[in-house]
Amino acid sequence: MSITHDYDVIAAEVHRKAMQNITDEMAITLVRTSGSPIVTESKDFSTCLMNTVPEHLGFSSYVLFHVGSSLIGTQVIAKEASVATDLQPGDGWIVNDPHSAGAMHQGDVSVIMPTFYEGEHIGWSFANMHVLDVGGVGISGYAPGAHDVWQEGMLFPPVRIIREGAIDSEWEKYIAANVRAPGPVLNDIRSMIASNNTAQKKLTNVINEFGLDSHREYCEINMDLSEQVLRERIEKIPDGTYEAVDWNEFDGHEGPDQLLELRLKLEVDGSDLRYHYSGVPQIDAFVNSTMGPMFGQAMTGLMTVLINGDLPVNGGLWRPIDVEIGPPGTIVNAVPPAPVSNAHSEVGMRACKLSKDVLCQALALSDDPVLRGRIAGQHQDGFPGNALFGNNQHGGVSVVFYPDNAIGAGGGAQTIMDGLDAYGLTCTTGGGIPDIENHEGADPVLFLWRRLIPNSGGPGQMRGGQALDQAYAVHYSDMMAGPGFNACAQVPPHGVGGGYPANAGIFYPVRNGNIQELLDKGLLPTYERFEGEKEDVRSKLGHIKLDHDTVFVALSGGGGGLGDPLLRDPEAVARDVAFEYTTPDHASSVYGVIVTDDHEVDEAATTAKREEIRATRIGGTPSAELKAPVNIGVSLTHDSGTWSCGSCSEELATGGGNWRDGAKLSEAPIAERYAEMGMQVRDRVEAPRVVMREHFCPSCAMSLGVDVVTDDLETLKAPEVGTPVAAAAS
């Protein structure tokens, strides 16, 4: 809503910053008290403050998708508390159930506590982190082998286990008996209590300064301001319907690899956004998602495209947004007994990619250059990882879960720069990669290398971010074992505006290696020296055993590119070759740039190579010059509904038709194209196959759009710009 009354602008901003500072200090308390590297270094946690509605007053933004779990979990507790007569300061609920309380997955445990002022209940505080273990057949909250939710570990619908600021002793015993690392898990819960205590203390100080009535007034003002600015941005997006499709890979059980389709239709109507998700029926595997992950990941996409960085995160941002996930019983709206222990990282992260996909389609057609400048290639939003359990070198046990390869994923290319290397996931805006020394000090592992993977970023005028290759051996133990999981091996993240998709992720063990032989010679087992027997494994493993000196290699995927690779500055390509970001063959075959042995651009050979690639694209000599486009990819004349090439203005479709129908199409299995391009993807041999559909302007041969789809899918729709169907019917 728009603010119509006068208010003290400076006081409102001071108050807004105070709310943000409280959530930041909650985060500092978590980091200082947890001791878990997942918290202290990876920063896999979030904190927030809410009013009694509940609505966000501040959010620490370390992991963005917790905007969903914090809101839904607190809503459930607030409903229970509304009929309770014994709500007291120091009470606290523990929550980790995706089905009943909006948790992202069981490994993400929340502690939610009421806040008070002079005896009056005035709101809620929330702290969440990924704890080391929650029991069940999986380790650290991941259970690829589970067939139902009860196999996955402990479930806490909102349970009030905290009284007077301490965990009930009987509940302590219960939790300790059901997890593999009771000490660290219980300490993490205590650290979340401490974080909430910080919220209560700091909030009291702020209200003492402002007064309770002014506190509430400024909370409303700042929510109204966030809503107002977001609505102003949405109004600059063309009304219409924007659609996208993606696939979740493989269920983790025996049988053929599955591709599970999910879709999103976004309706832009004035200053409102309506999300309509749909998906295939739920399955008996840990990939299913529920309301918390779906809402959180939809908002994560929106926050990174339209909000995060320059708009305060509070309840006002959710007012223009409606998220629908369709009828119960699908992979986007699963119900018990569906397993959900990777809801956030499987279907959930696909939901985030879909959110960004439709928003980038919409922003690309805006008349506002600032909004057009916010489009970007897809981030990887999937990572190859594992979780292990076994004895360590200190005479105890270790639960190993390294989010390194999640934070090591490449970021999508942007209009102003290449994608960030080792960017992380869309949601991990505050994430970090733990030091190797900390891993080796706590766990029985020896790291062999961490390096960036050449050619891993999606090609484009702006290149996608490069990804991390990491390898470690179980060196100080006879054996460790646990699940393995990789959400993005066959369907990599696509680019935007003619940019190309990026590397997908992959992992594999290497057995019978020469680690000890090298160490005995006084040599480090580096990437160049290490040898062993690579074992090809599937993307989801209920159990993988790593014996002594078995190496686990995990290669993250990169970020999608932006714009035609043939428009990339040849000097930038030469620098990438010099820095070993790009191989010479990749520079030549994809970018059309010939780089000499001393890393200089051979201009004549480059011009000839680029002309050769253009002619190959359309099967003949282009009739128009390829030049930097006014608009990335395709342009739309709104009055006539005419689609045209953003570079040479060649007409592609009229009257609201599909621009893809007027483009020159080249389609091939993605594994074949990646082999030609020197890039990485897992070949899918089952039907349907994953293909790359490249669309080129028939006149200038510019790359207009590159789709990554299954070979049985119809041509993707172009946006339908105009009044959304729902609005027209009302």
What residue spans do the PLM features occupy?
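Short, structured motif recognition centered on aromatic/hydrophobic residues
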Residues: 642-659, 692-696, 704
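Glycine/proline-enriched, intrinsically flexible loops and inter-domain linkers
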Residues: 1-89, 97-117, 121-622
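Sequence context of c-type cytochrome heme-c attachment sites
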Residues: 33, 626-635, 664-668, 675, ...
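Short recognition patches in nucleic-acid-associated and regulatory proteins
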Residues: 650-690, 709-711, 716-717
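Short, compact, well-ordered microdomains
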Residues: 688-725
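Glycine-rich phosphate-binding loop of nucleotide-binding enzymes
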Residues: 92
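Short linear recognition/processing motifs and adjacent strand/loop elements at protein termini
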Residues: 637, 679-688, 724-729
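Short, flexible, mixed-charge glycine/proline-rich loop motifs
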Residues: 628-644, 684-691
